Amino acid sequence: MSDSIPHPALSGRRVLIPGGTGGVGEGAVRSYLAAGAQVVVPTRSKERAEEFRLLLGEAATARLHLFEHDYTDFAGAEALVATMVDRLGGVDDVVAPIGGWWHGKRLWEIDEADWQAAFVSLATAHMAVLRAALPRMTRQGAYFIVVGEAAHVPIPGSGLVSMEQTALQMMHQVLAVELQGAKRVFLLELGPVATRFVEAVDPAQVTSAQIGAVAVTASASTRPGSSVRLLNRAQAEEALVSLGAAR
C-alpha cells in the first residue's frame, strides 16, 4: 500500500492499535509510524507478527512493537496495556479498528453462537480495551472508536453487526458526557474502505491510508473529541483540512 499523504510530527507519542493487522488497522499503523510515533500492535501469534512485519516492509521500523497478546477480554486487555506501560512508559493514543464482518441470517434465525460471535465478543473487546487504556492515557492523546456504515444503515442478514456498531456509537456519546472534556474521544464512522483485501476499488471510496491520516491529524490537533464521518474519499479530505486547522 502506498501512502503519499503528509503527516504531522508525533515523535515520542505512544500509540496502541488493537486490530492493527487488519485492513483498516494497517493504514493507522503506517500513518503513525510515518509520523514518528511508537506504535504497539497486538497479534495472535509470533507467526502473525512476522507476517505483518513483512507486509509493512520498510515502514516496519524499530518503533513498531508487536506484542503477542489476546486483548479480547478484560484480563487480556488489562495485561496488554500493562505491558505497554511497562515497556514504553505510558499510553498517549489508542486507535481501535476492532471487529470484522458477519452475514447470513435474519435476526430471528440466529443462534447463541452467532450472538456471542457477532455481538457479545466484539462489544466485549471494545469495552475491555477502553477500560484498560483510557484511565492510563495522557491528556494530550486521543482515543478513536472505529465503526462502519452498518452503525447507521440497517443491512438485512447482518443485523447483529448493525446492533453492535450502534452500541459503539452510544459508547462514544456516553464517554463524551462522562469525560466532560477531560480526555478526547473520537468516533470515526467509515463507509466502504479500500484496503489490501479489496480487489476492485471504487475511486470514491475512503482508503485505509486516509483513515490513518485523519487519526494522526486528530491526535496532533487540539480539537475536542467528536464524531467524524469518513463515508467516502471526499469526506476524508475535508476532515484532514478541518482537523489540520485545529493544530
Segments predicted by a language model, with ranges:
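Flexible N-terminal pre-Rossmann segment of NAD(P)-dependent oxidoreductases
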Residues: 1-17, 241-247
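Conserved glycine-rich cofactor-binding loop
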Residues: 21-22
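N-terminal Rossmann-fold NAD(P) dinucleotide-binding loop
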Residues: 25-26
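Conserved glycine-rich Rossmann-like NAD(P)H-binding loop of the short-chain dehydrogenase/reductase
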Residues: 36-51
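Rossmann-fold cofactor-recognition segment
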Residues: 56-75
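Conserved mid-core segment of classical short-chain dehydrogenase/reductases
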Residues: 99-116
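Catalytic loop of short-chain dehydrogenase/reductase
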Residues: 114-128, 139-177, 189-194
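C-terminal helical subdomain
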Residues: 173, 180-247
